[in-house]
Curated annotation (Swiss-Prot):
This is Cysteine--tRNA ligase. It is found in: Cytoplasm. GO terms for cellular component: cytosol. PANTHER family: CYSTEINE--TRNA LIGASE, CYTOPLASMIC, CYSTEINYL-TRNA SYNTHETASE. Zn(2+) binds at C27, C207, H232, E236. It is an enzyme of class 6 (ligase). One of its GO terms (molecular function) is ATP binding. Its cofactor is Zn(2+). It comes from the Bacteria. ATP binds at K267. Monomer. A motif ('KMSKS' region) lies at residues 264-268. Pfam families: CysS_C (PF23493), DALR_2 (PF09190), tRNA-synt_1e (PF01406).
Length: 465
């Protein structure tokens, strides 16, 4: 298995610190709002990577944190007249709802930064003691010049950063690139007691501390969105390695942005969507398959038209699964016949190809193509004459390959019938209202999905083709 390591900017053989085990840390949400589709891609991508590692036999300890104290949270809490804790509690609950709806598996642990104050204060104290941090008026800063390899993850040059970085320059700092690891209390902000007075941690130190306390000095994978590479992940490396003298993370994985209608997503452009808004209109399978239809390191473009195309493609897959489920009830031959054994063995090539694609830096786009190829093959060769054992094997294989991607796990019968009956009702209503364009559109859309309507004296009937 090979993974692309942002730290070295190349694909590397994936060799874990302990054979068969993976320690993985993913930067989670700041819990002051619902997560948007850009966040959703990050969560889906690393959920998929975790699932695939487990599919390949690894025992994965998967930590994804909640940032439940930072400037955005304080601002939002003050605006709505709540406490930061109340705000965090509320949006952690909302996160779990949306993540569950998106079929994201629960982490081994979702630590909250505020649960680790004692450990964070110890972390900061150790950095001061080792000469990597200094205190001024209750604020503690990390000295970037003291850490010789600062910039190794992002490829940034410290001198160039000092000249051109858009940072808040604090004249009290020894160097413009030094960053806060402990912030003194300001009016209206929550604070904790520390050796430097009342205050709260900086964002970067929170993740370093949680990773250290839950996974140890060195971890296998640290992951997050590409926007976190600098300064967040760069600063995590500096703090962690300055404290322990050991490599913080062996492999760094970063997922790319989601653009909306070929533009960067922003509220000012009115192209900002939360995952919840999309999940009200589309099933989780659709959104997951869309998010995984491009390589995780490549930006993807989001639009409703592309989601509709993904839904149509997914419907074709589910139609095939539905046909296999029906065959399972209808076929009369129970056991695998001799002539079917060779075909069953041939189907293994799809599993091997799928693993080959996913082993190459988790190429989900090509893995999905392999599933389509498998289903095309099965549609042609598995029929009413096949044995029940072969039909069941093909169904199980399709679901097996879909599982690491978090798709194709639903039983199709009830949900498909319910959806089609609902669309038939909408078409009948349109016909009564003489809205022929809408009626024809519904009929044509169903036909594209392999569903043919027949108008009979007894009413509308449908069948799959």
């Amino acid at each position: 298995m090979k993974v692309y390591n942002t730290l070295t900017n190349k694909k590397e053989e994936f060799l874990t610190l302990v054979p068969g085990e993976v320690k993985m840390y993913v930067c989670g949400p700041t819990v002051y709002n619902f997560f948007h589709i850009g966040n959703a891609r990050t969560f889906v991508v690393f959920d998929t990577i975790r699932r695939y590692l487990e599919y390949r036999g690894y025992k994965v300890k998967f930590i994804q944190n909640f940032t439940d104290i930072d400037d955005k949270m304080i601002k939002r809490a003050n605006e709505e007249g709540s406490t930061v804790k109340e705000l965090g509690d509320r949006f952690i609950k909302e996160y779990y709802k949306d993540a569950d709806d998106l079929n994201i598996e629960r982490a081994t642990k979702n630590p909250r930064a505020t649960e680790f104050m004692e450990e964070i204060i110890k972390f900061v104290s150790d950095l001061i003691e080792k000469g990597y941090a200094y205190e001024i008026d209750g604020d503690v800063y990390f000295s970037t010049k003291k850490f010789n390899s600062y910039g190794k993850l992002s490829g940034q040059n410290l001198e160039e950063l000092q000249l051109g970085a858009r940072i808040n320059v604090d004249e009290r700092k020894k160097d413009p690139m030094d960053f806060a690891i402990w912030k003194s209390q300001k009016p209206g902000e929550p604070a904790w007691e520390s050796p430097w007075g009342m205050g709260r941690p900086g964002w970067h130190i929170e993740c370093s501390c949680m990773a250290y306390n839950l996974l140890g000095e060195t971890i296998d994978i640290h992951a997050g969105g590409s926007d976190l590479s600098f300064p967040h992940h760069e600063n995590e490396i500096a703090q962690s390695e300055a404290r322990t003298g050991k490599q913080f993370a062996k492999y760094w994985l970063h997922s790319a942005f989601v653009n909306v209608n070929n533009q960067k997503m922003s509220k000012s452009l009115n192209n900002f969507f939360t995952a919840r808004e999309i999940l009200e209109k589309y099933d989780a399978d659709v959104l997951r398959m869309f998010m995984l239809s491009g390589h995780y390191r490549t930006q993807i473009n989001f639009s409703m038209e592309l989601l509709d195309s993904t839904k149509a493609a997914l419907d074709r897959l589910y139609n095939s699964i539905n046909n296999l489920e029906n065959l399972l009830d209808e076929v009369k031959n129970e056991e695998l016949r001799d002539e079917e054994l060779e075909y069953k063995n041939e189907l293994q090539k799809y599993k091997e190809k799928y693993i080959e694609k996913m082993d190459d830096d988790f190429n989900t786009a090509d893995a999905i193509s392999v599933i389509f190829d498998l289903i095309r093959d099965v549609n042609t060769n598995v029929t009413i004459e096949s044995s029940k054992e072969l039909v069941k094997y093909t169904l199980d294989l399709i679901r097996e390959l879909g599982n690491p991607l978090g798709i194709l796990q639903e039983s199709t019968k009830a949900s498909l019938e319910e959806e089609i009956e609902k669309l038939i009702e909408e078409r009948q209503k349109a016909r009564k209202e003489k809205n022929w364009a809408l009626a024809d559109k519904i009929r044509d859309n169903l036909k594209e999905r392999g569903i043919v309507l027949e108008d009979t004296p007894q009413g509308v009937r449908w069948k799959q083709i």
